[in-house]
Amino acid sequence: MQEEVRRLAEDARRERNWKRWGPYLAARQWGTVREDYSAAGTSWDYFPHDHARSRAYRWGEDGLLGVTDRECRLCFGLALWNGRDIILKERPFGLSGTEGNHGEDLKECYFFLDSTPTHSYMKALYKYPQAAFPYTRLVQESLRRTAADPEFELADAGVFDGGRYFDVFVEYAKAAPDDLLVRITAANRGPDAAALHLLPGLWFRNTWAWGRGGEEYAPKPSLRLTPERGVIADHATLGRFHLLAGRGPDGSAPRWLFTENETNMGRLFGAPSASPFVKDAFHEFLVNGRVEAVNPAGVGTKAAAHYALEIPAGGAVELRLRLCVGEGGAAAGAAAEAPDAEAALGAAFEAVFLERIREADEYYAATLEAALTDAERTVARQAAAGLLWSKQFYGYVVREWLEGDPAQPAAPPGRSQGRNHEWFHLHNRDVVSMPDTWEYPWYAAWDLAFHMIPFARLDPVFAREQLVLFLREWYMHPNGQLPAYEWALSDVNPPVHAWACWRVYKLTGPRGGRDRLFLERTFQKLLLNFTWWVNRKDLHGRNLFTGGFLGLDNIGVFDRSRPLPTGGHLEQADATAWMAFYCTTMLAMALELADGDAAYEDVASKFFEHFVAISDAMNCLGGTGLWDDQDGFYYDQLHVDGRHIPLRVRSMVGLIPLFACEVLEQEVLDRLPGFSRRLRWFLENRGDLAGHVAYMDSAGGNGRVRRLLAVPSRERLERVLRYMLDEREFLSPHGIRSLSRVHRDHPYEFNTPDGAHRVAYDPGESTTGLFGGNSNWRGPVWFPVNYLLVEALERYHYFYGDTLTVECPTGSGRRMTLAGVAHEISSRLTSLFLPAAGGRRPCHGADPRFASDPHWRDLVWFYEYFHGDDGRGAGASHQTGWTALVLSLLEGQARRRGGAAKDTGQPTGPGGRKGRT
């Protein structure tokens, strides 16, 4: 058995706590809702970046490429100073939502290079300029620019020109679950020798200053310096740990600095601080030369080893540290028994790193598809690394947050009825997969569902645990709603959680060997969520749904999360289609569970009939439902003053109806007599519903009979696909656009008493301020919906087979089966990350460094979305996150090249796993 597989098994059985330590330290805690105690809910202003170095956080911690335990009690991270910066670099910098010309925006260059699922080995890279970091210029230039202008990035300031920067590599390797080895390599890429102050640090999250008791609020812990054993960290629930620091390249020991993780009240508020030694002491010591800022007694709750380095041109230095359990902790490791730091950081240290790197390579060699090319494997490995590095401790207890803390100033009046007050039950204190480590350091429920598809390949147990977690009673609302994200927990995201549960169930074992208990647990709780949707979002009981913005931010004519300026209401093609998709997914889950428990046959019948009712409403209610027969497309409909007005915007809203597609196999139905009887009765007695669209048609193949449940009939499917596969409309060189390119020359306008509302093709960053302006669904390519389209097309092909071919691209004369179309879209999506002519990856735009510089060209960012014409990445740059779905797409392509999907004709899905096996 591979060592990493063994570690995963030991952790799953709770025999050894291999996942106790990981990259769970946030990249940004400032500017978040959970740190906001303002009266107006102005999170960015209440806790800005300028406060972060001086102010203790209430709900978490942040740092630079750091680690922490799963409860974020003890943290380790880097701090850097080049002798020129105005502040000590302790965390990544970026613009707030009000500073960026497209909303919040990271202004750093760091990359996640490797990680195993247990974090037994991790590697990341931070590129640190040798010139003064241009904090002020980045803010001022971004404020000067409009939403129509490109963003001003760190590289645009010239700080990487001539190679005048440091590549700072951080590696972690576990000798044992509580024995973490740290290797830091700083390489000078410039032509001259340059100074670098490097401060690896250890600190406790402040849980003692709030006046609360209970399991989350242990007594104040301590760090203290010992001559032989480095820093000793004592914590009431974590136990005792040692941090050992090796000598610098000149043979000298680092200078240890100590302070308290307490707010500098004097600097921020003109009030006395709880301690003379405060959070920003190391900044004051280095940048401002205030020696008295650090505690000479060598005690505190925050410590750092200060290395003052001079690195020659083209040279590199290596530093070694080790965080290990000590006496007072369980099962002290070899490092704790070593006579001194040098022994613990010597040959055995090097051997552990060599072993863990070898094991990581072995794990991915066995886990990733063998047919991946070297270029594809580079992308896949970094996508996996980004996904694993994006696990973060997330703490947020709404009741305590609304009340305020006993030892802090009283909460502002009205806070008890402010943001998220309906979620008084929410009690989050978990490691959760984040959309992006800096721009979105808070969970988003529908993002997380997509994360779990590639996660199921890497760590099936974690994938299942995350999906169950969001259905537990301390997350899910008592009424059945899932929490959206901290900015507005009651916002409505697309109902994809059931799909993720079903896909993860199928991906994590062969038929007969899957986790049926997981499927039952999630199905039972999803029934509550489905009922919430039906009761809250089907306003008139007609099976046509509203839902708000549904994660697609600015895609609509109106801000769909607010009351309409016209009055009336909106029946949304996407909301209704999402519910049809929800029905088919729950039907598939119920049929699986019914094969072994007949009680589920009744609920399977319920979801079958509910799907048919929704599909009928979408296609036929009032004549043609939300279908526009003139255009051959699905549109939102505005209902006002007795009129039904289609909003003729060709967008992803009209493609989402394709997602709802499920094939019923006769051999499955034969094992379910109760469901089959009800199905026969329905077909024979409800001809008004069963006979008017093609989704009830039968198809044969190899003697098998199948039935297709889908929203569009075959004829309507073909009409929609003509738009979707037209390069003048949706089909881009790198996937399916979120808005048709036809709206570039023909914007859609709708006039209301408050003015004209206009939707135009906008292929890159948003040129409007809707939803903060940092997201855009009016043209760019987005991975989650593209992934679902690819899956749906493979299911349609499973039913129609070679009897249905379409032109791809439209007008080209080249005909493909729907499986061929799915593979074409998948190939276009993965091409975003693969080197093309001249070594350029489309996702990196025109930046020549990423094409030809040996220190940049193999590095990949996984952006939030991609320019609808040229594929340039936009939005968040570390969205692994759902853009890690590229890992599943690459694997699917590799399997097809290897011929593994040719035997049965069953859909493999983009990740290469057979659909209903």
Language-model region placement:
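Active-site-proximal polar cores
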Residues: T68
